[in-house]
A protein has these predicted regions:
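Active-site neighborhoods and metal-handling regions in enzymes and metal-associated proteins
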Residues: 1-129
Length: 129
């Protein structure tokens, strides 16, 4: 349960950092601050832009330095979806090319939202009423 809440909180911390005029790196830096030493952030996966295609630029790194990367502008849309492992951050992909497992067999949790940079801050477009 703690890992699930950590992953959900990491996603939410990243979203809260997605403000107009900020930088993409602010998102990853907020995730890193939230997770601290309580888990491992899988660097191999990150968020991605949403637009004319499902997966497009920009890449949203979930481990980043604050004030780095592209400037966030109103109208940008992307996902924030950090994968947090209870053990090491190392993962492996099964032969089916889709299933991902932690290399050490530890538990992992991941939550995702699609975010639109609005005039006054992030707007989550994937919330259910």
């Amino acid at each position: 349960r703690a890992l699930v809440e950590l992953a959900r909180g990491a996603r939410d911390a990243g979203i809260a950092a997605a403000v107009p005029g900020g930088r993409l790196g602010d998102i990853g830096a907020a995730i890193v601050r939230h997770v601290g030493t309580s888990g491992s952030i899988v660097e191999a996966y990150g968020g991605h832009g949403i637009g004319r295609a499902m997966h497009m630029d920009p890449h949203v790194a979930h481990i980043a330095r604050p004030q780095s990367g592209h400037r966030l502008r109103e109208g940008m849309a992307f996902t924030v979806e950090p994968m947090i492992n209870a053990g090491t951050a190392t993962i492996r992909t099964d032969a089916d090319g889709w299933t991902v497992r932690t290399a050490d067999g530890a538990l992992s949790a991941q939550f995702e939202h699609t975010v639109l940079i609005g005039r006054h801050g992030p707007e989550i477009t994937t919330l259910l009423d």
